[in-house]
Amino acid sequence: MALARQCLSKRLAAGCALARPLHAASPVAAAAANSHGPLNFRALFSSAGADAAATTGGCAPAKGDGHSREVAVVDRSRRRWPWRDLRDFVPLRLVDGIGSALSQVAETLTRPLTGKVREDEERYRLRFEVPGLGKDDVRVYVDDGVLAIHGEKRDVVEEDRGRDGDGECWAAATYHAGLLLPEDAVAEGITAEVRDGVLHVTVPRSPERKRSVTEVKVR
């Protein structure tokens, strides 16, 4: 137990400034609980959205593409910005612990996560860094017009078989986000793939509907 206490105290001392509770709510529920609701895709490509992102210092435009934006998910001012709900899409790394006793008192540490969105006439393309996760660790689904992304992985990093008893050190990472789909998104055609620690999500767009104008005779 002495080793357990030492492991816990070191982790809490190093990460207390970033500590944050781990929530078990679903991505959609977390987004719904937010007063601003889920992220709206349209805000990513509006001038107002760009100004808001620049104000917070959390967004840097991607190079070479006028319809793409790269966002560093770091909330510095607590003000609303285009990727407001991606503050919830942050990996939560549980403090390394020994056995279930430590897992019950472990706090969470956050680390920055970057995301990028690109848009063309046929699709939206989203890219998120999810280091340590494979395709079996990520779930992507659409719930009532909200694109939900949830990922979690837990690894045993060290086993302790000393005189204090059996136990193990472990680490976990959790990712989640809720994104409100635009009206032209085709939910049935959404695809997702994890490659080299990066989640790629493609959202096809429906063809632009032609506007119908009918003249009304005024009498």
UniProtKB/Swiss-Prot annotation:
The keyword Mitochondrion applies. It comes from the Eukaryota. The keyword Zinc does not apply. Keywords: Mitochondrion, Stress response, Transit peptide. Residues 104-219 form the sHSP domain. GO terms for cellular component: mitochondrion. Pfam families: HSP20. CDD domains: ACD_sHsps-like. Induction: By heat shock. Residues 1-29 form a transit peptide. It is found in: Mitochondrion. One of its GO terms (biological process) is response to heat. InterPro entries: A-crystallin/Hsp20_dom, HSP20-like_chaperone, HSP21-like. May form oligomeric structures. Belongs to the small heat shock protein (HSP20) family. This is 23.6 kDa heat shock protein, mitochondrial. It comes from Oryza sativa subsp. japonica (Rice).
